[in-house]
Structure formats: C-alpha cells, structure tokens
Amino acid sequence: TINIDSQKVWDRMWKHSVVAGINWKKEGFEQKRRELTNWRNHSSFDSTTYPGGLYEINKGATNNLALFVQDTYRPNFNWAIYTGLRIDRFKKFDGQHVTYDTTNNRYDTVNHGEGSYTEWSPKLAIEHYVTDSLNVYASYGHSFNPPPLSQVYRYTDVVRANPNLDPERSDTFEVGMKKEWGTKTALNLSAFYVKTKDKVKYVTHYDNNGDVDYKMY
C-alpha cells in the first residue's frame, strides 16, 4: 500500500480560512490458496492434487487520486459558512482469478475488466451561534466510497469476489443544535437523511435445496 497525503492551510484571509490538499493511495494484493495436509502447519502443502498445493490465486489493485479544497467563512461572531469540494479519480485494475483444472492438469485464468470512476463531491454547512452556549446548524454533503479490495477480488470458501462492484455514492442532509451548560454538561441534537446509490450489501445466495450456496457483496 502506498498512501501520500499533503495539504496547505491559509488562515485568516479576509474572514476566510482555506484548506486545500491532495491524496494519492494505491493498494494491491495477491491471495494464494493452498491445500494443506495439516491445517496447523501452513507449510504442509499437499501436492498430490495441486502443484505445491496451490489451487487458486486471486489478485488485483486499486488507485485513487483526490484533490480537495475547503473554505470556512465567518462574516461575524454569530455566523459560520463552510463550503468544500473534492474530486476523486478511482480505478480498479489487474484483477485476476486463477484456478487449477484437475481434469486437464492446468491453471485457468480469468482476467477481470478494469473500472474507472470520476466523482465530484461538494459540501455546504451553515452554523448560527444564537448565544455563547447555543448554536444551530444545517449541512449537506456528497460522499464517494470505493469498495475495499477484499470485496472486489478476494475469495474464501463461502464468499465470492465481485469485480463488478461499484463505489457507493451518498447525499447526506443534516440539521441540529448544540447546547452547553457550563463546562461539564452539553446536549447535542441532530436529524439527518441519507440517500445512497449503489449501496454495498452482503447478500446470501441459496441453491435449489434452500442451502447456502455462496455469499457476495
């Protein structure tokens, strides 16, 4: 995994505070599944059926580049306005599923297709300080959540990979209030609504007998 993050802050610019930054993250994995003669000994490869006990290989990679900027504007002591914008460029690639064919004594390879996504994520929030101890706020934000590698490319005995899994996209609306009594007592109340597209769910699939066949995100 490679993760590079950098940001710059411009503070007190004509009642504005601005933060801008960049984030780059690249992940990759390779999963090798082997048959063992002794499950307690991870080196006890069973080569009677599979070469070196190796019966399956799964691998893949993701890359995400994000640029963002956020501004905090305080026109006076009673109001604060927060605006922000983020752009993500996400790509999944090099997905591969390799299994050993015991009939023909060979490895068969399935190459998963690539997927690229570009998403703009704005946000806006307004906060009003009614008194020194009471403030109310309203906010909207859009979020972009790519699935982890384990959901896209990794197989287990029960769970199948889903290389066609798309990132989640959500819009969140929230209103709330914060009240303080002295330095030890506070009350926070909020109500929010979230609308999600391409929500990732853990789904169980059954065979014709009603038994669990496999699970998938």
Annotate each predicted stretch with a short phrase.
Residues T1, Q31-S44, H97-Y107, V152-A161, ...:
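Flexible, surface-exposed loop regions and adjacent strand-edge segments
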Residues T1-T99, Y129, T185-A191:
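Face-selective signature of the C-terminal outer-membrane beta-barrel domain
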Residues I2-S6, N63-V69, W120-L124, A161, ...:
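Hydrophobic, lipid-facing positions within transmembrane beta-strands of outer-membrane proteins
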Residues K26-R34, R89-H97, E114-T118, F144-V152, ...:
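Gram-negative outer-membrane beta-barrel proteins
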Residues P51, H112, P122, I126, ...:
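Short, functionally important structural connectors and interaction interfaces within domains
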Residues Y129, N135-G141, N145, D166-Y217:
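Membrane-embedded beta-barrel scaffold of Gram-negative outer-membrane proteins
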